């Protein structure tokens, strides 16, 4: 019996992101027409990507970003992020748009009285 390590790595990544963000993993997120988003929080739709072996670079596809934003909107989310790793068990990095970046900077500066 062969195992699909890519799915195992993906499931582990999704669980880690959900735990870190206080969200929940979406079951079968890519398997339905109007589904999507590997992790959902109260305010964020997160799509997760990772390689099956370590990489020194990782290309972000415009189609991923467009599909993510479309699916997020369809499900009532106004913020989305693409999470990726350079290796299956590595650190997660998050790609956000300029509006969310501005919100993040404003929030951090307000919290730190800057």
Over which residues does each language-model region extend?
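Catalytic phosphate/metal-binding cores of nucleic-acid and nucleotide-processing enzymes, i.e., regions
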Residues: 1-114
